C-alpha cells in the first residue's frame, strides 16, 4: 500500500515539475525561439511527427503574434501532407479566424480549397478558389487558385 502512495506522490511531483517547466518557457523568448526553430528544422527534414508536436506545443504554450499563425499554418500543412483533412482544415480555419490580417491567410483559404478537392467536393473547391481570386487578387495564392481552376476545366 505504501508503494502505491509513493508512486502517486512521484507522479504528482512529475506533473507539477512538468507544468513548472512549461510555465517558465512562456515568458522566455529564447525558449520560444528554440521550440519554433526546432519545429521548422524538423519540418525541413520531413520529420513531420516531430515537427507537428513542436508546432502544437508552441501554440499551446506561447503567445507570439507572428509565430502562432505560422505554427497553425504549418500544422495545417503537415496534416494535409499526412492526409488528415479534418485536422488540416481546423488548423487553417484557426489561422483565418484568429489572425485574419496575417499574410498566410490567403494561402490558408487556398489550402482549404485543396482539402475540398482532395475530398472530391469539386464545387466547394471551385467556390473557395474563386473566393481567393476575388478577395486576394494581388496575392500569389490567387495565381495558384486560378491555375487550379483552369486545370479543372
What are these model-derived regions, one by one?
Residues 1-153:
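Acidic, polar-rich low-complexity tracts and alpha-helical solenoid repeat scaffolds
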Amino acid at each position: 500500500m505504501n508503494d502505491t502512495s509513493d508512486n502517486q506522490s512521484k507522479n504528482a511531483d512529475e506533473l507539477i515539475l512538468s507544468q513548472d517547466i512549461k510555465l517558465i518557457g512562456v515568458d522566455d523568448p529564447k525558449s520560444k525561439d528554440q521550440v519554433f526553430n526546432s519545429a521548422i528544422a524538423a519540418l525541413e527534414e520531413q520529420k513531420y511527427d516531430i515537427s507537428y508536436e513542436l508546432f502544437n506545443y508552441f501554440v499551446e504554450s506561447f503567445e507570439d503574434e507572428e509565430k502562432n499563425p505560422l505554427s497553425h499554418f504549418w500544422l495545417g500543412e503537415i496534416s494535409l501532407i499526412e492526409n488528415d483533412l479534418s485536422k488540416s482544415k481546423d488548423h487553417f480555419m484557426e489561422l483565418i479566424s484568429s489572425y485574419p490580417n496575417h499574410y498566410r491567410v490567403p494561402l490558408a483559404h487556398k489550402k482549404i480549397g485543396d482539402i475540398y478537392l482532395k475530398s472530391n467536393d469539386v464545387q466547394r473547391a471551385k467556390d473557395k478558389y474563386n473566393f481567393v481570386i476575388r478577395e486576394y487578387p494581388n496575392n500569389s495564392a490567387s495565381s495558384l487558385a486560378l491555375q487550379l481552376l483552369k486545370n479543372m476545366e
